[in-house]
Amino acid sequence: MHDSLVILAGGASSRMKKEAVTNNLSPEEIAQANERSKGLIGVGASGRPLLDYLLWNAKKADYKNIYIIIGEQGELFKEFYGSKMKDNDFHGLNISFAVQYIPEGRVKPFGTADALFQAVEQYPELNSQFYSVCNSDNLYSAEALRALRETESPNAFISYDRDAMDFPLERISRFAIAKLDQNNQLLDILEKPTEEDLEQYKDSEGKIRVSMNAFKFNGNTLYIHLKNCPVHPERDEKELPTVLLNSVKENPQTTVGIPFSEHVPDLTAKEDIAEVKTYLAKYYPDLNWNNKN
């Protein structure tokens, strides 16, 4: 089993910075939403960031080495998790930072695949091991993170039951869906599915499966696909689902969808802040870092 987790936190947070259509946020919360990376917004007890809770679950799942991919202006991460670029101790987790630099001629970062490629270039040891990858603005359960560690499949992703997601239907309908075979091996990922698509994409349990960007990768075989990832024609970014599908085409039957049926709290827009705060207060009333259980 591997013990490295790469956390994607270098994005532009464009949707979070849009004007809120809710009036239940304080001026401080609005300011943080406009200025901070999403995972650093203070939604937890004593104003601690969402990322604390993700790291807490990662520790419960027995990860040891955490690589946080930050943007070029990511100094605030170091105030929370360690001042050095690598090997900071945060409650027993070894925290290192990779920087996603913006290419010349672009204004925004070049996408999740570019972020991971820059990280493995800065930490090449990842290319000779297995590792997990996830977002910084989602709160994945310790059980889901542990499942990525424990699977024997070279590559994997958490394959969530779409109906278990506690989001508005309009939002859920925008999620890309995964097509799996009878053994839960990934065959395809479909963006913007129609109602007709949904029926033929049901898995062996009759469920519609979605990815929330929680992956396990074989660094050795993934590297070439990260390096050669094409740019998405609509979004003008290099994206991890593209890398995953290209890897599957070259290495079929090596990427399993691990079925999970649970909600994944998500900080995408200002409207999510109050809901995530309520969720954390209910399910994570106290983070006692000295007690893993």
PLM region spans:
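Conserved N-terminal catalytic core of the sugar/cofactor nucleotidyltransferase
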Residues: 1-7, 13-31, 44-129
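Conserved alpha/beta core of the MobA/IspD/sugar-nucleotide pyrophosphorylase nucleotidyltransferase superfamily
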Residues: 5, 189-293
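Structural beta-sheet core signal
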Residues: 5-7, 68, 133, 157-158, ...
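Hydrophobic packing residues within well-ordered alpha-helices of enzyme cores
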Residues: 16, 77-81, 148, 226, ...
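A structural signal for short hydrophobic beta-strand segments in well-ordered beta-sheet cores
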Residues: 40, 177-180, 257
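Phosphate- and divalent-cation-binding pockets in alpha/beta enzyme and binding domains
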Residues: 76-79, 143, 243, 275
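Conserved beta-loop-beta/alpha segment of the NTase-like Rossmann-fold superfamily
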Residues: 92-177
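Conserved core of the sugar-phosphate nucleotidyltransferase
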Residues: 139-224
